Swiss-Prot record:
Highly expressed in skeletal muscle and heart. Not detected in other tissues tested. Residues 10-47 form a coiled coil. It comes from Homo sapiens. GO terms for cellular component: M band. PROSITE patterns: LRR. The lineage of its organism: Eukaryota, Metazoa, Chordata, Craniata, Vertebrata. Component of the sarcomeric M-band which plays a role in myocyte response to biomechanical stress. May regulate expression of other M-band proteins via an SRF-dependent pathway. Important for normal contractile function in heart. The gene is LRRC39. Keywords: Coiled coil, Cytoplasm, Leucine-rich repeat, Muscle protein, Repeat. The keyword Repeat applies. SMART domains: LRR_TYP. This is Leucine-rich repeat-containing protein 39. It comes from the Eukaryota. LRR repeats lie at residues 84-105, 107-128, 130-151, 153-176, 177-197, 200-221, 223-244, 246-267, 269-290.
Length: 335
């Protein structure tokens, strides 16, 4: 009996020793594998960094990272070693996301990541207080973070052709230096309140959205000189549009406008308008032009057309007041 106990104890002791050895061996193998993976990562990071350094150029005194038509679905953390960069230009790289560490590039002035497959903008973007231009057109972005409003130096923001953006956070009205905004080819049904309240905005493109009407408060954009609203579903224009005294270019082609408000003749600075492809209820034609075919084409639904339309609209209104029932359908001065 005693011999059996001793034998069992010896076996257990040997088993325990072997289990410890096996456990230690597995731990050593795991550490070695992790170390090898770490070496591979370090090597890959160094290779990536070398490749990235080859893409750095200097133009007009700026340090620029320029990559085009090369596959970079993600950007390595080794990029942080190039924190002196002032401009990124990454086009058609298949980039899936803006790195979370983007906020550490405090010298960035221009961030151009257009024509990629980016689906979101990280909140860290708000740390780029020197950023003047953010160009993210032709991506797959759906929402814009409120933190973007912290980019106090931002002057130009382009989010065109993301298809699904339908609103902007109200905080973006705090972008006091923003003068240029491109929201074309998205999913907006109205002009966001944030846009209406941007104090310095001069140039706005909301073409190819789903706008049905313009708010009366559009007159708030007193510094706006260019407004693109082509290819929407706008049915009428507010009377307050005539209060936009600095507006020089207004494009309203391919909408559902049935009339041109008379008050628009008060817009003294208006130099270019386009009402082409709208179901306007009055049919008016212009006198023959002595200009080139290009000029004639441009003016066919342009400023002269607008003034002629308004004159005809006013003339018809006067006739109705005077009780006349025989009115011409159109103005035609072809001789």
């Amino acid at each position: 009996m005693t011999e059996n106990v001793v034998c069992t104890g010896a076996v257990n002791a040997v088993k325990e020793v072997w289990e410890k050895r096996i456990k230690k061996l597995n731990e050593d193998l795991k550490r070695e594998k992790e170390f090898q993976h770490k070496l591979v990562r370090i090597w890959e990071e160094r290779v990536s960094l070398t490749k990235l350094r080859e893409k750095v150029t200097r133009e007009d005194g700026r340090v620029i990272l320029k990559i085009e038509k090369e596959e970079w679905k993600t950007l390595p953390s080794s990029l942080l070693k190039l924190n002196q960069l002032q401009e990124w230009q990454l086009h058609r790289t298949g980039l899936l996301k803006i790195p979370e560490f983007i906020g550490r590039f405090q010298n960035l002035i221009v961030l151009d990541l257009s024509r990629n497959t980016i689906s979101e903008i990280p909140p860290g973007i708000g740390l780029l207080t020197r950023l003047q231009e953010l160009i993210l057109s032709y991506n797959k972005i759906k929402t814009v973070p409120k933190e973007l409003s912290n980019c106090a130096s931002l002057e130009k923001l382009e989010l065109a052709v993301n298809r699904d953006i339908c609103d902007l956070p109200q905080e973006l009205s705090n972008l006091l230096k923003l003068t240029h905004l491109d929201l074309s080819m998205n999913d907006f049904t109205t002009i966001p309140l944030a846009v209406l309240n941007m104090p310095a905005l001069e140039w706005l493109d909301m073409g190819s959205n789903k706008l049905e009407q313009l708010p009366d408060t559009i007159e708030r954009m007193q510094n706006l000189h260019t407004l693109w609203l082509q290819r929407n579903e706008i049915t009428c224009l507010p009377q307050t549009i005539s209060n936009m005294k600095n507006l020089g270019t207004l494009v309203l082609s391919n909408n559902k406008l049935q009339d041109i408000p008379v008050c628009m003749e008060e817009m003294a600075n208006l130099r270019f308008v386009n009402f082409r492809d709208n179901p306007l209820k009055l049919k008016v034609s212009l006198p023959p032009s002595e200009g080139t075919d290009e000029e004639e084409e441009r003016e066919l639904f342009g400023l002269q057309f607008m003034h002629t339309y308004i004159q005809e609209s006013r003339r018809r209104a006067d006739h109705q007041v005077n009780g006349s029932t025989t009115l011409p359908i159109s103005i035609n001065t072809d001789g």
